Amino acid sequence: EIELALVKMYKATGDEKYLKLSKFFIDERGTEPNFFETEAEARNEKGLNIMQELGYKYWQAHLPVREQTTAEGHSVRAMYLYAGAADIARETQERELFEVLRKMWDNVTGKRMYITAAVGSQRYGESFSLDYDLPNDTIYGETCASIGLVFFAQRMLQMDPDRKYSDVIEKAIYNGILSGISLDGKKFFYVNPLEVAPEVCEHRVDHRHVKTRRPGWYDCACCPANVSRLYTSIGDYMYSVSREGEIYVHIFANNSANISLNDVNVELDVKTCYPWDGNISIDVNPEHAGEFTIAVRVPSWCLEP
């Protein structure tokens, strides 16, 4: 997450040292001499001391970021890395990096993502495996990985207002992430399976990571805090404004929003019972007359908008 945090610091302070350091981390990942080899030598160790079977793929350090073409390794770390790289691509307006990330997006969502927007299909390393390897019962599908996918999608949207990104955000918030928290908000899933047989989970070691009920807490409690953060900041994902001053409506929900454009403040009042009802009304109230564009997402699954 350091790349994301550094870009936020840059935006808050305007100090380019934070942006440059974030870019440095992106640029250095997977280059030679490999950081992990240097560290191992300093400790008088040989090779990696964790997840050795995955090698440097576990850390997304098997290749420089701009040479990677498939999602590999720890799924949460991968999503955060791609989100951080997208921040750098946007802030520096680097087209090459954006194109790499677009190909990576297509690999993740077209070949390595579940119908629920869960990602990361194997327990070992909480990681990706290979294209179309998406078992329903031994899935890992960590809640944090779907949240990271939303982070990645949001940043790609800021550069390319294509509905394919907001479609995945919507799919994740209603499925792959929402399954990670109980209705009362007190219990959580770390792993989000699509198929559960309680007796199998009890007796088969390769199913032990799959829980039949949401626990109240975890020793590694990243998901409860992350899912709470995501849903309390859901408004950040509903709209965006392009550099040209266009307002994009990405996610539908009952809400009111005040959006600042270059020379006018615009209030949007959205009324809907979505997703239970597909009817959505948007009242547009600018503070004074002016010309601007509002682009409303038509979901890819909507055949008759």
Q: Which ranges hold each PLM region?
A:
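Glycan-recognition and catalytic cores of secretory/periplasmic carbohydrate-active enzymes
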Residues: 1-305
